Amino acid sequence: APVPVELVGVTKRYGPTTAVAGLDLEVQPAQVLALLGPNGAGKTTTVEMCEGFVRPDAGSIRVLGLDPIADNAALRPRIGVMLQGGGGYPAARAAEMLNLVAAYSANPLDPTWLLGTLGLTDAARTTYRRLSGGQQQRLALACAIVGRPELVFLDEPTAGMDAHARLVVWELIDGLRRDGVTVVLTTHQLKEAEELADRIVIINHGAQVAA
């Protein structure tokens, strides 16, 4: 079976800026891998290329053995994606959004249970635009995992959360690992990477510094 994520010599430029520079990366099954680095290090761009949102300028990417762009329709149902800053429908209620995502899966997690686990029960009927930033982040995480994907990409999953919410999210990510889900997360917090990851890859200026 192919490894869940494989990048070979991946480069992405935006004008004169090289966001990712010749990156090699391999993620093993059921591994939690943290991409650790400061803002602007190239972490989000790396994840966006793996998700098929951004096309690399050079190198090759395989996710679950597939090309994230050419095979996106086949890949999409098998991966969970949590975007930085949430990315929901402003007028949709929290529970509606989660139920909509769950409906695309043959064997979803129970949306009501997931909302409760993430402390969103009281916000279930609140529209997305009226949720706090931390609530939007937690809802984005719920949407990423409700379909029981094989592989989850989490971009700064606890950004803007208080300490209690952060611990709840950490426990949920730990549960994904125990269930055999492969997780790739980005963070600029060393403590978060150490707490969650089986392997930490430090990225700066779009290149791997250490692993």
What is each residue range found by the language model?
Residues V152-E156:
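Catalytic Walker B motif of ABC-type/P-loop ATPase nucleotide-binding domains
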Residues G59-A70, L75:
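Conserved ABC transporter NBD signature motif
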Residues N99, A103, P108-A123:
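Conserved ABC ATPase "signature" region
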Residues E51:
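Helix-to-loop junction immediately C-terminal to a conserved catalytic motif
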Residues L141:
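Hydrophobic anchor residue at the start of the ABC signature
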